[in-house]
């Protein structure tokens, strides 16, 4: 979470970032704490590559008023707030066209970078970080025919908070990279699209995504 927060803080300054993994998987943080000095040597020798990672921007609307807006490197999650056994309804649109509606605990809209995070744990696909697409993954949907859907990066996704099965006012929130949260209520909608800014990530080991994926998965 530290690297995600830092990415949102520095993205407008176009400062390349280098992550040091002190946790578990760490797909973004390719350097572990035992390799810090080796990493510094490579930096000083200009032995690195810079990889661009797309971000999402989300705008929450209540009627014709904006109630919140932010960017995310990993994902934007729209989820319920309240009793743990209550699901809420979601109405989903793509480029102003109706897609589907279902009851669930939430919905994840993830970038290729975020596809190895929360979306993956909810059954979403792993997407190569240089792929030009986003993925929508439901969280515990109450239907058998709802699965992750991949969209081109330029598609605009709108998620509207519905009434759910109880047909009462529901409360939810939109979370940006698990950090900034914007409250939502029935009828509110969030419009999500590719951000005009991107994050620059330093790569030192020159490994392909497939090689990194194999290493991370074999160690966990």
Where does each model-flagged region fall?
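Short Gly/Thr/Asp-enriched flexible loops that form oxyanion-binding sites at enzyme active sites
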Residues: 5-12, 119-123
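Short glycine-rich anion-binding loops that position phosphate/pyrophosphate groups of nucleotides
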Residues: 1-2, 25, 113-115
């Amino acid at each position: 979470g530290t690297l995600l927060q830092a990415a949102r803080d520095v993205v407008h300054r176009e400062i390349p970032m280098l992550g040091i993994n002190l946790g578990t998987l760490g797909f973004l943080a390719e350097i572990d704490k035992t390799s810090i000095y080796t990493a510094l040597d490579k930096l000083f020798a200009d032995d690195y590559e810079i990889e661009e990672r797309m971000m999402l921007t989300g705008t929450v609307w209540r009627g014709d008023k904006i109630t919140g807006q932010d960017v995310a490197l990993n994902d934007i999650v729209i989820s319920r707030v309240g009793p743990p056994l209550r699901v809420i309804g979601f109405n989903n649109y793509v480029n102003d066209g109706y897609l589907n509606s279902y009851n669930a605990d939430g919905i994840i809209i993830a970038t290729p970078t975020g596809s190895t995070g929360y979306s993956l744990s909810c059954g979403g696909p792993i997407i190569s970080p240089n792929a030009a697409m986003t993925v929508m993954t439901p969280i515990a949907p109450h239907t058998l025919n709802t699965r992750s859907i991949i969209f081109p990066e330029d598609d605009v996704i709108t998620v509207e908070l519905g009434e759910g099965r109880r047909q009462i006012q529901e409360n939810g929130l939109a979370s940006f990279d698990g950090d900034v949260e914007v409250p939502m209520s029935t009828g509110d909608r969030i419009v999500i699209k590719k951000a005009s800014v991107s994050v620059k990530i330093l790569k030192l080991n020159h490994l392909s995504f497939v090689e990194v994926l194999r290493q991370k998965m074999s160690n966990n």
